[in-house]
Amino acid sequence: MLMPRRMKYRKQQRGRLKGATKGGDYVAFGDYGLVALEPAWITAQQIEAARVAMVRHFRRGGKIFIRIFPDKPYTKKPLEVRMGKGKGNVEGYVAVVKPGRVMFEVAGVTEEQAMEALRIAGHKLPIKTKIVRRDAYDEAQ
């Protein structure tokens, strides 16, 4: 699972998922990308499930770029515990994803393989996604 090696503070406040993404909104490394259309917290387990699905679809060959990283800790109180008495323990880590963010990119495979792999990966995520292609405009940047 992806998680930060060290953190200055163990727990964070939740924050808000407002507005569009600031950066990371174009295909930078691969030929095809999977873009988020909704705001969400994507857990480390969901990122790993999408990655494994793509790797299995490619069998051999192809390169996968994961453009999001779960660096935000989320906490949960134990079952049957009354409210109060402090914030719960860290349960896992999430990546904060806003609309327009490129989450995964693939390279080194045919268009059909890339489209199918990204479609399968999109089904592993709790948000609506779309597949984008690197075009001439992106290469000029």
Curated annotation (Swiss-Prot):
GO biological process: translation
Record-level GO cellular component terms: cytosolic large ribosomal subunit
Entry superkingdom: Bacteria
InterPro entries linked: Ribosomal_uL16, Ribosomal_uL16_bact-type, Ribosomal_uL16_dom, Ribosomal_uL16_sf
One annotated GO molecular function: structural constituent of ribosome
Keywords: Ribonucleoprotein, Ribosomal protein, RNA-binding, rRNA-binding, tRNA-binding
Family as reported in the entry's similarity comment: Belongs to the universal ribosomal protein uL16 family.
Functional summary from the UniProt entry: This protein binds directly to 23S rRNA. Interacts with the A site tRNA.
Subunit structure: Part of the 50S ribosomal subunit.
Annotated protein name in UniProt: Large ribosomal subunit protein uL16
Species, as recorded: Thermus thermophilus (strain ATCC 27634 / DSM 579 / HB8)
